[in-house]
Curated annotation (Swiss-Prot):
The keyword Ribonucleoprotein applies. Disulfide bonds: none annotated. One of its GO terms (biological process) is translation. Belongs to the bacterial ribosomal protein bL27 family. It comes from the Bacteria. One of its GO terms (molecular function) is structural constituent of ribosome. The lineage of its organism: Bacteria, Pseudomonadati, Pseudomonadota, Alphaproteobacteria, Hyphomicrobiales. This is Large ribosomal subunit protein bL27. Keywords: Ribonucleoprotein, Ribosomal protein. It comes from Afipia carboxidovorans (strain ATCC 49405 / DSM 1227 / KCTC 32145 / OM5).
Length: 89
């Protein structure tokens, strides 16, 4: 005679892997064209000068320069790449 009731299968116990989202190049860092600046879902950060946005909202550099984050009115944060020659002046 069994002394334990039959155990039901658990409905928990699974999780998805992290998607490695976030800032990849921080403010002040030097980037080259094609470098990924941020991976995001939606537009947490918006593309500014010399920054493009991919179909999955990834922000990438279009020119060589220094990354700069700037908050604008309306609560939006724009990411720009300031060319090194301009930054030196």
């Amino acid at each position: 005679m069994a002394h334990k009731k039959a155990g039901g299968s658990s409905r928990n116990g699974r999780d998805s892997a992290g998607k490695r989202l976030g800032i990849k190049a921080f403010g002040g860092q030097i980037v080259i064209p094609g470098n990924i600046i941020a991976r995001q879902r939606g537009t947490t950060w918006h593309p500014g000068l010399n920054v493009g946005m991919g179909t999955d909202h990834t922000l990438f550099a279009k020119a060589e320069g220094r990354v700069e984050f700037r908050a604008k009115t309306g609560g939006r944060t724009f990411v720009s790449v300031i060319p090194v020659a301009e930054a030196a002046e």
